[in-house]
Amino acid sequence: MYTKLLDKQTKLALIGLGYVGLPIAMEFAKHVSVIGFDINEDRLDKLRNCIDPCGELPTEVFEHKDITFTSSIEKLREASFYVIAVPTPIDSHNEPDLSPLLGATRTVGKVLKRGDYVVYESTVYPGCTEEDCIPILEEVSGLRVGEDFKVGYSPERINPGDKVHTLLNTVKIVSGCDAEALETISEVYKLVVQAGLHRAPSIKVAEAAKIIENTQRDVNIALMNELSIIFDRMGVNTFDVLKAAGTKWNFLPFSPGLVGGHCIGVDPYYLVHKAKELQYHTKMINSGRYVNDSMGRYIGKKVVKKIISQGKNILGAHVLVMGMTFKENVSDIRNSKVADIINEFKDFGAEVDVMDPFASPLEVLQEYGIRLVERPGKKYDAVVVAVAHTTYLKLDESYFMSITNEHAVLADVKGVYRGSIHQMIYWSL
């Protein structure tokens, strides 16, 4: 398989061309012939014109790459090595929504041939690949795993907006349904990963490793958020405490903040789901999720109290929220907890303007019913810097004072302006 790919006697297909799939596809396209498959025609049109809809990859990345973008299932028949990197979200009840993953699996099953390989990159609970996906591949294709085709799991570690930790320089976990599959999958991924591979002993181990990466981070941030609530009641600045505690060599460098997006705020629920199937009720994971999911409303309430403390009526107060994406310097608005802050203000009768230089106004309107403004349009009683975009880091107190009324509140969620605000009412986590 490896030699056939290198000699371009066959092709590699990447299913799902979003934040995760596209960077992987573009790296492989430097070495082998790639079919980039997606069901979103608007996304495909942009990609064919060398535009990354996610805003992560510059135009020049598309140059000199052996890649074809398509939504044609028939085109997939030209491939023999399939990589599935589609979203694995949760539903309104915080249960895993496997419909994109299982849909992609059925699509690949329709074109699967003897000798083919299927590798999953999507984050799932341990057991999902073997218990949910492989049976569909076998049913649709009429083939048998191990005998007729091979399956592996290699969890994605793409971090949108991060130009330091990339696919190339981040160790990649690989696993396979048997020793032969593991060897071949490892050979193929060596083409695009310079940092080396970690060969997991089983698919289930690789799945579990990925799910706990994000669960661990979620729980640690939840601890910082809870400490922030406690320290706020003491009148102690959380970041001052963390700076002092960080002088010890084994203190872990986490900080409080909003936890949203398609990974950290979602993946723990996949592990919770699997634990419930095993008749175990997760305690720490659930507690962490509760704390982090409540932080948007908590921030909103704190700012409301600050406004009222200045003798102002919150009903009709003007608030500007800066940042709508789930994290800094990305366009992704999925599961953004900034929406909770905004809704809290609206529940109290405040008038809210929202701006974000990275977010798509149309996507924000469709997802949250919020109309973004391009620039501040009035004098505000409070400004909430909810997302620490690089463009916001250059702003100073004089700017914030120029767009606010007297005795205005500046809520600095990530604490990026701490120590530099002296005249406004300042608050941070």
Locate each region found by the language model.
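Structural/interface elements that position substrates and couple domains in central-metabolism enzymes
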Residues: 1-429
